[in-house]
Amino acid sequence: MSRLQFQLQATDGHARRGRLTFPRGTVETPAFMPVGTYGSVKGILPEHIRALGAEIILGNTFHLYLRPGLDVIGDHGGLHGFARWDGPILTDSGGFQVFSLAHRRKITEQGVTFSSPTDGARVFLGPEESMKIQKVLDSDIVMIFDECTPYPATEDLARRSMELSLRWAQRSRDAHDGLGNDAALFGIVQGGVHPDLRSRSLDGLQSIGFDGYAIGGLAVGEPEHERNAMLEHLHPRLPAECPRYLMGVGRPEDLVEGVARGVDMFDCVMPTRNARNGHYFTSFGTVRIRNAKYERDLDTIEPGCGCHACSSGYTRSYLRHLDRCNEMLAPMLGTLHNLWYYEKLMADMRAAIASGTFVEFRRSFYAARGATTPPLPGETS
């Protein structure tokens, strides 16, 4: 039996306010999970992550398996001890990273053989191997091993990929249970941008039975309207009593639109990666700190923001100087700000759903950016 409990506390339209409960802690939803690819969220300490409002982080099975390897992580009792993070952790299965290798992999019914990006060695990864790795990592949410359907993909290619992922889903379930792992196991809905394939994928996953359902293959270059159409198609079909996770999607607008379509969980490298490139998220849009107009700008990134960078008074001028000099403090402060912004955005959406004001929140979100609120299904612009 899984250690995960999910309680749906409120709805407003399709937006959902809930709570995930694990032995290691509670996660309020909708939630954004900072990505710690190699066991750390780049540039900040675990205690900073918690102070920013994050309650769960993501670890990368593929990269941690290759480096430092399971023996080293096992010496620490798992990923929590290794990374010094005592809250819940979700680990992906490695499927997306294998997908991203493109020309360096070979997919068969059994799994995927690929050249390691670290040393070029041939490595095999399949459902059973992924479940064994995640058992050693001792994550709180385990993802099944799947094939991420590319975009664009013909319907025939998307169908064959989805059917392979379903067979791997059953093997993942069997291996996870066979290992006696009581962590939550999430299925991943595939099928590209084809509604009928998405329905078939979800039906197959539900017949196997999972603790939560992720929506995969929607951060691979598809237009926003096609992504939203798939979320709208899946919303009434996904089991209301289970958490829903939109994988790898993470612009602020994407989070708002995902929540509006019933998504509970998100992850993305965008807030941390963009911080390292001098792009800082605010309620009025993105501050691109390398622009010359910020050279003598004495404002903080976002006046009134409660993050460490803004509340301490670091100016845009100073941050631009640090960035131009390649000082490591620039991405550190930028990361603190961006993750604070993301976590506050999620907290504000949770409050709006609970109070029945999500429609007004969504309008205000776009108005602050000088943008028109895009209509939801059934609305007119």
UniProtKB/Swiss-Prot annotation:
Note on how the cofactor is bound: Binds 1 zinc ion per subunit.
Pathways per UniProt: tRNA modification; tRNA-queuosine biosynthesis
Any single GO CC term annotated in Swiss-Prot or TrEMBL for this entry: cytosol
InterPro entries noted in UniProt: ArchSynthase1/Queuine_TRR, TGT, TGT-like_sf, tRNA_ribo_trans-like
Catalytic activity: 7-aminomethyl-7-carbaguanine + guanosine(34) in tRNA = 7-aminomethyl-7-carbaguanosine(34) in tRNA + guanine
GO biological process, one term: tRNA wobble guanine modification
Ranges for region RNA binding: 248-254, 272-276
Domain of life (superkingdom): Bacteria
Binding residues for substrate: 92-96, 146, 190, 217
Keywords: Glycosyltransferase, Metal-binding, Queuosine biosynthesis, Transferase, tRNA processing, Zinc
Active-site residues, as the UniProt record annotates them: 92, 267
Function: Catalyzes the base-exchange of a guanine (G) residue with the queuine precursor 7-aminomethyl-7-deazaguanine (PreQ1) at position 34 (anticodon wobble position) in tRNAs with GU(N) anticodons (tRNA-Asp, -Asn, -His and -Tyr). Catalysis occurs through a double-displacement mechanism. The nucleophile active site attacks the C1' of nucleotide 34 to detach the guanine base from the RNA, forming a covalent enzyme-RNA intermediate. The proton acceptor active site deprotonates the incoming PreQ1, allowing a nucleophilic attack on the C1' of the ribose to form the product.
NCBIfam families: Q_tRNA_tgt, tgt_general
Family: Belongs to the queuine tRNA-ribosyltransferase family.
Subunit structure: Homodimer. Within each dimer, one monomer is responsible for RNA recognition and catalysis, while the other monomer binds to the replacement base PreQ1.
PANTHER family recorded: QUEUINE TRNA-RIBOSYLTRANSFERASE (PTHR46499:SF1)
Protein name: Queuine tRNA-ribosyltransferase
Taxonomic source organism: Xanthomonas oryzae pv. oryzae (strain KACC10331 / KXO85)
